[in-house]
Amino acid sequence: MQSPTSNGNHEFDSIQITLASPDVIKSWSHGEVKKPETINYRTFKPERDGLFCAKIFGPVKDFECLCGKYKRRKFQGVICEKCGVEVTTAKVRRDRMGHIDLASPVAHIWFLKSLPSRIGLLLDMTLRDIERVLYFESYIVTEPGLTSLEKYQLLDDEDYYKALEEFGDEFTAKMGAEAVQDLLKDIDLDLEIDELREAIPQTGSETKLKKMSKRLKLLEAFRDSNNKPEWMVMNILPVLPPDLRPLVPLEGGRFATSDLNDLYRRVINRNNRLKRLLELSAPDIIVRNEKRMLQESVDALLDNGRRGRAITGSNKRPLKSLADMIKGKQGRFRQNLLGKRVDYSGRSVIVVGPTLRLHQCGLPKKMALELFKPFTYNKLLSHGLATTIKAAKKMVEREEPQVWDMLAMVIREHPVLLNRAPTLHRLGLQAFEPVLIEGKAIQLHPLVCTAFNADFDGDQMAVHVPLTLEAQLESRALMMSTNNILSPANGEPIIVPSQDVVLGLYYISRSSVNAKGEGMIFATVNEALRAIGSNDLHVNAKIKVRVTETHIDDDGNRTKETSIKDTVAGRLLIWNIMPVGMSFDECNEEMTKKNISKLINSCYRKVGVKESVMFADQLMYLGFAQATLSGVSIGIDDMVIPPLKKQIIEVAEAEVREIEDQFEQGFVTAGERYNKVVDIWSRTNDKVAKAMMDNLATDKIINAKGEEEEQKSFNSIFIMSDSGARGSAAQIRQLAGMRGLMAKPDGSIIETPIKANFREGLTVLQYFISTHGARKGLADTALKTANSGYLTRRLVDVAQDLVITSDDCGTEQGLLMKPHIQGGEIIEKLGELVLGRVTARDVTYNDNAEKILIPAGTLIDEHWVKVLDNNAIDDIWVRSVITCNIEHGVCSQCYGRDLARGHKVNIGESVGVMAAQSIGEPGTQLTMRTFHVGGAASSASVDNSISVRSAGQAHFENMKTVQHTDGHLVIVSRSAEIALTDELGRERERYKVPYGSSVLVKNEDQVEGGQTIAKWDPHTHPIITEFAGTARFSEITDGLTATVKVDDATGMSSFEILATRDRSSSAKDLRPAIILNTDEGKEVVYFLPAETIIRVSDGEKVAAGSILGRVPQASSGTKDITGGLPRVADLFEARRPKDHAIMAEMTGVVSFGKETKGKNRFIITNEDGEIHEELIPKWRQINVFENETVARGEVIADGPQNPHDILRLKGQTALADYIVNEVQDVYRLQGVKINDKHIEVIIRQMLRKVEITDGGDSNHFKGDQVEYADIKALNAKLEAEDKFPVQFERQLLGITKASLATESFISAASFQETTRVLTAAAVTGKVDELRGLKENVVVGRLIPAGTGLAYHKARKEKAEQKLQDKDLNAAFDMSATTDATDFASFDEAFAQELNQGNH
């Protein structure tokens, strides 16, 4: 380490961590610490040669030696001859180290115990054996000589003395760290490496291979990093500078000390005692014990509690060792390097500031004065109001009137940053211009509350002052609230009115029958507004008015258009504040929260930021004013209980009684009864809610003609809910419907519902039941917040180094985007999915593939989305970060539009962190619970047919059918789909159709809305013949392989195949089958699985499409569906689900081999005759039959899919589709919109590593994990040299694993498992290139993203320039002195330039 005084050059590009050799430790040290004393208890001066010695570590006071002979600056650098202290600043006590010479070597515990044990790997010994040697339990042979002993053999005392008697001093055996050190010194790295390289190809067993390649890697790491193995055992121990382990006097003569001092004291005491014992040549057993104690005390100093019991202090808590100092949330990394406290900041409670403009915040005068103090002093001085800083300080303290004027000048156009914790995404920290206010609370603009997730129930916010010019510039240009209108998560406006504002706008945009002024016609908008102002026209009256609109086309040309519109008077108030260029239709509707959001979005896209901001402000003022005037309030009479409620509940009670009776008679089981009861009550609850909403939603009113007319209700509660201002249907249901079913704390549902609502009031029992749910809610919220925060932290960590680094990587690859379909319905149109992305291939017209509609490389904006929609395009290829070709970072073409700005993403945008925040921020809104679905609820909802919603044309896809005798088509393919298109050819619906369904329409048929197009039996799985012919039974014998079943209802008898376990031993190997002799004379065998019910008789003629047998589907029992946050975490951690789906490993024909106990042998044979077999447990339901052809990656046995299988069998695009859709499903359920891009960014990071399957001509081995980018570069190099490239498979790593496997050890160490990461890095001598954001924050530099990217670029160019200059200077052979001075001035110039922000 360089001391700050030695003016070192702090320009560096990478950091390396290695083992410290004894010489290096000596070179750091300024002297040996010989005594355990700290300071003299009388004089409080440090003891000489002790842990705080001034001679070693430097003076305690600035420029003053210990004895006081030399004081003041002029003696700087003098070493006092009396006390030996160098006269210099006391700061050197922070970086001068000392050392302790150990009397006996000591093994470093990290390299011993941190798994895998490095010492163990190098010596090829088990940890247990090494520990026995180290802690003096047994001897180890280090030099066998000519004896029968072997090197590395362990001997206990008895064996050792026997061997001594037998061989004398022919051999050497030692114990303790000394022995281990000798053995490590003896290792010949090159020889061992060569031996292993020869041995590896010959080994057969996987475990041996793994161990050998691990050992080889470690040996090579030692060889390449110039670390010596024996350095893992220390002879000399460095001592931390004393100011980093301070001794602080408390009042009452006591001291607070760092735990490290205690730990060092123990080491020094034991070391000195050992030295003395060795001088006295004490008995072996005593010395041995002392050496063991020394080893233990050094262990405790380095990592307390890693081995044995942790050493505790006086108060019984374990002492904090050096390792504890750096790890964990309170450790050096997370507490001090990644999270620092910030000066020039304050915090206070927030209150609403409804009069502010969007870019302003109200700052209390007192706070402002404190925050801007230095600036205020400066202004007072420069205006001559104060002569000295001291005078200015006095004026500010007295708060004289001039001070406020100066403060106002200082604050003008000097933005401040407001931050609300928890800062879950970048909008939690925004810049505002301060407005000075009285009082002590910060005023916040209501529209930014959504972004901060703030409310005014006592929330606090922090204020920070950007000091430098660059910081102010950045705050204004990038962080100002007016520049953050769109949410980075989905590109929709986040500056959206909510609550009162929505209520006000909704109220004035609603029409009411027979309002004052109904039917009036106005020539101009102003005329109508005057009428409203003079109370001649009510805001809810329906009127006609002449409106002039201005249309602006793409080139900016304006055209005016006047027309008469039917509207509501209040909507003109909104039209009055709308910017020029917007159409009247956009505000001529009921202003619910959704519509207001649409309005602001459209305003942003049409007329730009500035207008939108002003419009949003005006909307807010209007909304607040009108909400006040509307007089909407809430009263108990607004909670109207539906008259039908009583009747609905009576019906339900009767149904429940019936089920209870059935249960008592034994017709249904207890589980079924419970499920059915719960089912009835949840249906009833919905019925009551519907009746209530229908009742609330309309009013009867007398119109102008005196007749009764129905209109939308003006009930206050309904208005609040309908507008989206406050309250949901579910909450109103509890007020005026029925409370319904409650859950117990364990998540199970209590079957007696609460039939009352809050208006009627609850009985004691009902109240007690509902307390359950309320408590669970609070406990859940606390858990959820912690879990969600941890998910965000893992996401940020895995994606932090992903930055846009270039404009275009030139790749042709991408993802195929299709509309998102669920339950046959299109939930997300293609246009919504591809908006803001770049096309990867040309998009052609549907009817003409030669004609290009959109060329490749086009950024799809709103205009193009319309084009896609109008041309009925169903799928298009777009660029994606997953397929981006750049090694570090991604290119802006693959990323597309920056969602928060609405244009193509800038170079330097840190998209990784943005993605992590966008996914993590809504985490708190997701549920934590696992859904128990089962019983009546799920079995009732089994589909058995498909009915289309809208009319259109049916298209069959992947469909293989046979014509049945009854004229229907029967499907005999697995992944058949029916798509429905409208008259323009746009896809409207899409359905998956199961194997064995009857299709009731033909391809290209026109179908009507509501028509059933396919049906099937949901409870059995059919075996269908594709050919006509004669069926013959093979090995189907009653009593052996089958049994005759008689159907009670119909009296028909049929064969049922017996399961293997139910057959007699002689019939176990028989394979029951139906052999079909087709009319063409071919023979087709259909093997029958267990429990098949045969539907044909022996020798019967069958038609194509006939069902030969049916396999009953096991009715799905209660399945737990993991939902919400845990599901998202599972997906990103790439966990293998339990009982996951089994997929076909290759394309080929299926056959079943000999069964083993409990397993079926499943075989696939491909065209080349290659065979893949696997054993599948018998209880798994296999979807394919003998002789069927399956495609690679096709699902054979149902279950949740395993992402690793998808990657291996179907490739990375299929994997991306799967993860994106699964994650989106969870968020969609909660109504949260996140752009797919963000999820893709995380997937890219999960796919960074590859596993090597064949090393080719490289020095990698099978099973190595390497970065994808490195392998690409390596292969390019190998191919250029005509060598064999490396073969590899892409790996999918969970986010935690991926974060720890990152190239940067600083980033990994600051994430988790600090000890393990640092140990591994030190042994291999790892170099951190400081590419990511985190590493740069840790070393205290600007991050290489955003404005920092330019800084780093400039820095690199300067460094290169310097090197060139150096070469030139060498060439001119200039004298060294001028050279040095040049560089000093050069550095200064560069520093100045940076400070002025010229870069």
Curated annotation (Swiss-Prot):
Catalytic activity: RNA(n) + a ribonucleoside 5'-triphosphate = RNA(n+1) + diphosphate
Binding positions (Mg(2+)): 455, 457, 459
Top-level division of the source organism's lineage: Bacteria
Cofactor requirement: Mg(2+); Zn(2+)
Residues that hold Zn(2+) 2 according to the record: 809, 884, 891, 894
One Pfam entry name: RNA_pol_Rpb1_1
Family according to the record: Belongs to the RNA polymerase beta' chain family.
Function: DNA-dependent RNA polymerase catalyzes the transcription of DNA into RNA using the four ribonucleoside triphosphates as substrates.
Record protein name field: DNA-directed RNA polymerase subunit beta'
Protein source organism: Psychrobacter cryohalolentis (strain ATCC BAA-1226 / DSM 17306 / VKM B-2378 / K5)
Gene this chain is encoded by: rpoC
